[in-house]
Swiss-Prot record:
The keyword Iron-sulfur does not apply. The lineage of its organism: Bacteria, Bacillati, Bacillota, Bacilli, Bacillales. It comes from Bacillus velezensis (strain DSM 23117 / BGSC 10A6 / LMG 26770 / FZB42) (Bacillus amyloliquefaciens subsp. plantarum). This is Glutamate--tRNA ligase. The gene is gltX. A motif ('HIGH' region) lies at residues 11-21. The keyword Protein biosynthesis applies. One of its GO terms (biological process) is glutamyl-tRNA aminoacylation. Belongs to the class-I aminoacyl-tRNA synthetase family. Glutamate--tRNA ligase type 1 subfamily. Monomer. GO terms for cellular component: cytosol.
Length: 483
């Protein structure tokens, strides 16, 4: 192996880009870029049953959307292609035939029923199920007899007996396995397709990977891949297994867990910003030196240290993601926030797709009211709901405010003031509130809170005069008089 760092993200095209896979890609990307190395994307599509049409392109599109680029892959080619495993079968054939020739692999004619029976018997005896090796030493005659019966063989790797397979994991430290607990494993299925562990080991060697960074659910695959490397006399790459991502109940993220949005495409659809997601995912199981939490892509590349990958599970905190995204939204100018949010108002049917100049101005003012507090684009629909309703509902907290004794006087005087205004502007609305204070003697919360609750249905919200302007004189007066 040369000195240049070469790492890969190797998705299966089985669906959309999951947050956990995005993190794996991101840490490999940051490691490569921070070391001046190469980041490669390889498509692992050997499991044909699970592949989804468009899955590959969707994954690549959303890696780009997040802000990653790569040096070699299916879309741009490279020196060590093809980068799609389904196009590499002739390459794998050469290597498994070499193992067969050297006696390091063998043909296994066991049927699924025989293997299942063996497995059940081992479990009944309290043993860890593994292949017994009963076809390890078949004679040529026995093999021919099985073939004559119409049996198709798989090919198994001959696991050396009594061996310790150890490696120093970047994240976990020293990890070791006993070969006797593994059993001879299949490297080529009966249909001639290489298995995951075999294809990955061959590809990682031929593509000159120096490091393999992936989720800890792959730890059990590592000794098998190491043994394949060793069987060919190849240098073994450095492994690092990242901890799981867990939800707020400290349970492993499951695709069935609906408390967390798990696919990058969904975040895009909800109006999260790619830069914010990049930032948030970059801190899922990795921590910088110091307290700062907001970093650009360039800053991440500059400070990324693979040795600071966390040994503890990474907590996916939805509140934290919203906070991070809000920081990025606040940094946008109003035109950008309108571009982010307007499609969501249109999709929800709140505003039309063709807006007059007057309507555009109203929508811009509305969106600007919520610019500072907006967590993500689609949230604008919920935040601004009160501006699109004829009638509003008052919750218990709001009702309690409206039951205070000064309320009828405050609201009736304020309604009269609004009706008298020649122009309905925030400045004149603010002056009207002050006039109510002067006329009634009520001030502070006793004055502002009933007005806010009566007109908006909420006990807190954006600047009150601006909100009342956008609600409109007629609606505001009607709501004030209905209490």
């Amino acid at each position: 192996m040369g000195n240049e760092v070469r790492v890969r993200y190797a998705p299966s095209p089985t669906g959309h880009l999951h947050i956990g896979n995005a993190r794996t890609a991101l840490f490999n990307y940051l490691f490569a870029r921070s070391q001046g190395g190469k980041f490669i994307i390889r498509i692992e599509d050997t499991d044909k049953k699970r592949n989804i049409e468009g899955g590959e392109q969707s994954q690549l599109n959303y890696l780009k959307w997040l802000g990653m680029d790569w040096d070699e892959s299916v879309d741009i080619g490279g020196e060590y292609g093809p980068y799609r495993q389904s196009e590499r079968n002739d390459i794998y054939k050469k290597y498994y035939e070499e193992l067969l020739e050297k006696g390091l692999a063998y043909k296994c004619f066991c049927t699924e029923e025989e293997l299942e029976k063996e497995r059940e018997e081992q479990i009944a005896r309290g043993e860890m199920p593994r292949y017994s090796g009963k076809h390890r030493n078949l004679t040529q005659e026995e093999q021919e007899r099985f073939l004559a019966e119409g049996r198709q063989p798989s090919i198994r790797f001959r696991v050396p007996e009594g061996k310790i397979i150890a490696f120093n994991d970047i994240v976990k430290g020293e990890i070791s396995f006993e070969s006797d607990g593994i059993g001879d494993f299949v490297i080529v299925k009966k249909d001639g397709t290489p298995t995951y562990n075999f294809a990955v080991a061959i590809d990682d060697y031929l593509m000159k990977m120096t490091h393999v960074l992936r989720g800890e659910d792959h730890i059990s695959n590592t000794p098998k891949q190491i043994m394949i490397f060793q069987a060919f006399g190849w240098d073994v790459p450095v492994f690092g297994h990242m901890t799981l991502i867990v939800n707020e109940s400290r349970k492993k993220l499951s695709k069935r867990d609906e408390s967390i949005i798990q696919f990058i495409e969904q975040y895009d659809e909800l109006g999260y910003l790619p830069e914010a997601l990049f930032n948030f995912i970059g801190l899922l199981g990795w921590s910088p030196v110091g307290e700062e939490e907001l970093f650009t892509r360039e800053q991440f590349i500059e400070i990324f240290d693979v040795n600071r990958l966390s040994k503890s599970p990474a907590l996916f905190d939805m509140h934290k993601l919203k906070w991070v995204n809000n920081q990025y939204v606040k940094a946008l100018d109003l035109d950008q926030v309108v571009e982010l949010t307007l499609p969501h108002l249109q999709k929800a049917g709140k505003v039309g797709t063709e807006l007059s100049a007057e309507e555009q101005e109203w929508v811009r003012k509305l969106i600007s009211l919520y610019h500072e507090q907006l967590s993500y684009g689609a949230e604008i629909v919920e935040l601004t709901d009160l501006f699109f309703k004829d009638e509003i509902e008052y919750n218990q907290e709001a009702k309690a405010v409206l039951e205070e004794e000064q309320v009828p006087e405050v609201l009736s005087v304020f309604a009269a003031k609004l009706e008298e205004l020649e122009e309905f502007t925030p400045e004149l609305i603010k002056a009207s509130i002050k006039a109510v204070q002067k006329e009634t003697g009520h001030k502070g919360k006793k004055l502002f809170m009933p007005i806010r609750v009566a007109v908006t249905g909420q006990t807190h919200g954006p600047e009150l005069p601006q909100a009342i302007e956008l609600i409109g004189r007629e609606t505001a007066v009607r709501r004030l008089k209905s209490i």
